[in-house]
């Protein structure tokens, strides 16, 4: 049943028959072009049709497959419908959560408006339920956890979806929930604001929308709809379903529904549904309280859903250990950002106030609806994107490919093209001296190392030398950097990471495809790219780190639970996260001193970035605007990864010729390292 905006409940009872707005949308051309970004899309088959749009499979000129939601301009007859579309676009653009359909692009031609969205290969829960008739409780437990995580994220951003239903809840290729269609979404100015519009899909509308329009409604309407969804998944149809809309509303008003005796449903599931389908919105449970309900803590808890669910009822194990249940529950809850203390998603730009400027000619979309920079979320599910190179990456390539080789030409290109980055006020204001600083560092090492302890000494030297070399490079003291051989070995860096430090630790993947977890108990577990070798490392405070290497098939019992958790991290990152760089072949660095793998030894969050330090002294700074700077272990070379995931290597000795943006980032890195070294001396 289509979503409708309803002035009065009775208007939905006897709607006038008229052509769907989507019928006004003819099949668009085979080749589509976003003129602003100069991105081309090839249009393929129609994969869906709703009340107001048609959906087509498209492929961009980088080979990425998306879904294009196509709205005919002829269907936008008045300012009200145009503003409604603008609102949908701006709200959806502001969303960045692993369980919300990704918004990729937006553009128009003379006939249509195109919304390029993340493709959900396994379609909607409506289509799944048509095939399956009913789902099992473990499936519903998993899906509801992700639905609630997406709702928690929306509500935190003061967005009410208002049209949560089976048809708007999609599944990606890994059977993860993706909530879409923000056509009826409302953005609140503050948490106390109430919305008055009567809107929604009859089977899912909360009673306060229909019958308390004077008092208005708020976030709780989405929880009512979530209860309807949960009931439908377990029973096979919505609780108030009827052929007549008038009867549906009568049942909603009376809260008249029941649980069929021929359906096996647990008491916990019934209780949770009943609490969500409470007429008084003020006593519906909060989202985190819902996840704390007994329904989510009994039965079987899956960490993923197999493709088997798409066509048949899965057979779940008859029993599950408490540790396995809790681990899977924590994993799914943390990934979706639901549960007390958890959050997921990226705080993107808040929705802009809608523009009501007059529109010239055939143009409908304001320019602000086509963002020039698409910010990739830290946690992202779906195909990896390869957008048009950013200004930063273009400038860096121009600098590296400069034909005359002069520093002046490179300075001009980099400075003119890069965007500015403003670091926090410097805590280190002294001028950096030339080569004597590194020599004096060595001379003073003995007296100062007594302050930092045995284990910290090598780290302290690494941090101080890196900070000093960056400072000298920025001040054009390049002669101080030529006394050592340039880096000849490839530089590894972190391509993916996910933070579960509230429960376990921080997981990451390196550019050689090895995977590791830095656990909260100061241990690290590493898994080689070929999954044949496991390395376990302790991080003692005052002695040298001692790694233990095992064949993957002979891991001791004492660390098997950590290995299982690492595999969960690996699986999650493989399915859900984009790499920091486009796919390339990376040569594995040779280790002259041992056969051990590199691992992340330290990480530090600051206001501007998160810093990682690898065990061989490589530093990596991931800035909040998704640009990354990697500094080699000898501080001879840096790698710049821009937010479009392009990778450029530059010699640090040319820092004086870098763009103001990159120089500012290096200054910030230097200051952070200096501050860290100082703290090591006094800790």
From Swiss-Prot:
Protein keywords: ATP-binding, Cell cycle, Cell division, Centromere, Chromosome, Cytoplasm, Cytoskeleton, Kinase, Kinetochore, Mitosis, Nucleotide-binding, Phosphoprotein, Repeat, Serine/threonine-protein kinase, Transferase
Catalytic residues as annotated in Swiss-Prot or TrEMBL: 163
Cellular component, GO, one term: kinetochore
Effect of residue 493 to L: Loss of function and impairs interaction with cut23 and spac6b12.08
Main location (coarse class): nucleus
Annotated phenotype, changing residue 197 to V: Loss of function
First-tier enzyme category under EC: transferase
Effect of residue 193 to G: Loss of function
SUPFAM superfamilies in alphabetical order: Polo-box domain, Protein kinase-like (PK-like)
Residue span, POLO box domain: 493-575, 596-678
Signal peptide: none
Cell compartments where the protein resides: Chromosome, Centromere, Kinetochore; Cytoplasm, Cytoskeleton, Microtubule organizing center, Spindle pole body
Cell cycle recorded as keyword: yes
Modified residues (Phosphoserine): 442, 585
Protein role: Serine/threonine-protein kinase that performs several important functions throughout M phase of the cell cycle. During prometaphase and metaphase, phosphorylates the kinetochore component dam1 of unaligned or unattached chromosomes to promote mitotic sister chromatid biorientation. During meiosis I and together with moa1, required both for mono-orientation of kinetochores on sister chromosomes and protection of centromeric cohesin from separase-mediated cleavage. Behaves as a 'septum-promoting factor', and could also be involved in inducing other late events of cell division.
Protein name, UniProt field: Serine/threonine-protein kinase plo1
């Amino acid at each position: 049943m289509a979503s409708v905006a309803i002035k009065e409940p009775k208007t939905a009872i006897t709607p006038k028959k008229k052509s769907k707005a989507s019928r006004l949308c003819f099949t668009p051309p085979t080749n589509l072009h976003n003129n602003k970004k100069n991105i081309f899309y090839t249009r393929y088959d129609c994969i869906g049709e709703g009340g107001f749009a048609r959906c087509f499979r498209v492929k961009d000129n980088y080979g990425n497959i998306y879904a294009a939601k196509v709205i005919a301009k002829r269907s936008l007859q008045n300012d009200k419908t145009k503003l409604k579309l603008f609102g949908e676009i701006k709200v959806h653009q502001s969303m960045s959560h692993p369980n919300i359909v990704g918004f990729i692009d937006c553009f128009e031609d003379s006939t249509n408006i195109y919304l390029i969205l993340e493709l959900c290969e396994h379609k909607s829960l409506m289509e799944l339920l048509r095939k399956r008739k009913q789902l099992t409780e473990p499936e519903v437990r998993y899906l509801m956890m992700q639905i609630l995580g997406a709702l928690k994220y929306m509500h935190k951003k003061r967005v009410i979806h208002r049209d949560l239903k089976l048809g708007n809840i999609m599944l990606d290729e890994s059977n993860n929930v993706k909530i879409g269609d923000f056509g009826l979404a409302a953005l609140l100015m503050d948490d106390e604001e109430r919305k008055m519009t009567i809107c929604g899909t009859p089977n899912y509308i909360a009673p306060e929308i229909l019958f308390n329009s004077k008092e208005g409604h708020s976030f709780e309407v989405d929880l009512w709809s979530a209860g309807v969804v949960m009931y439908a998944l377990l029973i096979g149809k919505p609780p108030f379903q009827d052929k007549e809309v008038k009867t549906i509303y009568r049942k909603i008003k009376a809260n008249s529904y029941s649980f069929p005796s021929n359906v096996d449903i647990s008491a916990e599931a019934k209780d949770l549904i009943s609490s969500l389908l409470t007429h008084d919105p003020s006593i519906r449970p909060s989202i985190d309280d819902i996840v704390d309900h007994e329904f989510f803590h009994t039965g079987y808890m899956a960490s993923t859903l197999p493709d088997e669910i798409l066509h048949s009822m899965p057979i779940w194990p008859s029993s599950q250990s408490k540790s396995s249940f809790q681990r899977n529950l924590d994993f799914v809850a943390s990934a979706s950002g639901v549960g007390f203390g958890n959050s997921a998603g990226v705080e993107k730009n808040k929705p802009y106030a809608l523009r009501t400027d007059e529109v010239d000619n055939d143009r409908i979309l304001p320019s602000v609806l086509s963002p020039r920079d698409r910010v990739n979320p830290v946690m992202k599910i779906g195909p990896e994107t390869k957008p048009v190179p950013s200004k930063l990456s273009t400038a860096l390539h121009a600098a590296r490919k400069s034909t005359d080789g002069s520093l002046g030409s490179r300075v001009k290109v980099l400075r003119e093209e890069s965007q500015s980055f403003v670091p926090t006020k410097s805590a280190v204001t002294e001028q950096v001296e030339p080569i004597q600083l590194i020599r004096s560092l060595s001379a003073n090492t003995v007296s100062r190392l007594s302050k930092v302890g045995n284990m910290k000494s090598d780290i302290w030297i690494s941090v101080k030398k890196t900070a000093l070399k960056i400072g000298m490079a920025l001040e054009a003291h390049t002669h101080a950097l030529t006394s050592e051989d340039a880096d000849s070995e490839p530089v590894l860096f972190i391509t993916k990471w996910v933070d579960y430090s509230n429960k376990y630790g921080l997981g990451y993947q390196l550019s050689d495809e090895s995977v590791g977890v830095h656990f909260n108990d100061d241990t690290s577990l590493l898994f080689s790219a070929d999954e044949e070798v496991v390395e376990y490392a302790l991080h003692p405070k005052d002695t040298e780190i001692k790694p233990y290497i095992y064949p993957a098939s002979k891991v001791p019992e004492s660390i098997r639970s950590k290995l299982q958790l690492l595999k969960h991290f690996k699986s999650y990152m493989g399915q859900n996260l984009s790499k920091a760089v486009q796919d390339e072949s990376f040569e594995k660095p040779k280790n002259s001193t041992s056969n051990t793998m590199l691992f992340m030894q330290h990480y530090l969050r600051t206001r501007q970035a998160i810093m990682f330090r690898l065990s061989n002294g490589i530093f990596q700074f991931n800035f909040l605007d998704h640009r990354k700077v990697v500094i080699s272990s000898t501080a001879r070379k840096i790698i710049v990864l821009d937010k479009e995931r392009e990778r450029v290597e530059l010699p640090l000795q040319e820092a004086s010729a870098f763009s103001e943006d990159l120089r500012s980032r290096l200054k910030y890195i230097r200051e952070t390292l200096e501050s860290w070294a100082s703290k090591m001396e006094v800790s």
